[in-house]
Amino acid sequence: MAKKSMIAKQKRTPKFKVQAYTRCERCGRPHSVYRKFKLCRICFRELAYKGQIPGVKKASW
């Protein structure tokens, strides 16, 4: 879990546009966040396996 201070800091508008970054909405992780779902890869995988993300299913070929 991310520190509450880092989550609060990220919500503020940055002084420069390039300083903005994405965080997982579920756990607050700053790395490997899918923009479309606003989830990190770990949370995405957990929710996809449970079937809680509509339209996502395990690939097989």
Swiss-Prot record:
GO biological process: translation
SUPFAM superfamilies linked to this entry: Glucocorticoid receptor-like (DNA-binding domain)
Positions bound to Zn(2+): 24, 27, 40, 43
Family the UniProt entry places it in: Belongs to the universal ribosomal protein uS14 family. Zinc-binding uS14 subfamily.
Protein name: Small ribosomal subunit protein uS14
Cofactor: Zn(2+)
Matches recorded under PANTHER family: 30S RIBOSOMAL PROTEIN S14, SMALL RIBOSOMAL SUBUNIT PROTEIN US14B
Listed HAMAP family: Ribosomal_uS14_2_B
Keyword terms, alphabetized: Metal-binding, Ribonucleoprotein, Ribosomal protein, RNA-binding, rRNA-binding, Zinc
The species this protein was found in: Anoxybacillus flavithermus (strain DSM 21510 / WK1)
Function statement: Binds 16S rRNA, required for the assembly of 30S particles and may also be responsible for determining the conformation of the 16S rRNA at the A site.
Textual note on the cofactor: Binds 1 zinc ion per subunit.
One Gene Ontology CC term in the entry: small ribosomal subunit
One term of GO molecular function: zinc ion binding
Subunit structure: Part of the 30S ribosomal subunit. Contacts proteins S3 and S10.
Pfam families, A to Z: Ribosomal_S14
UniProt xrefs under InterPro entries: Ribosomal_uS14, Ribosomal_uS14_bact, Ribosomal_uS14_CS, Ribosomal_uS14_sf
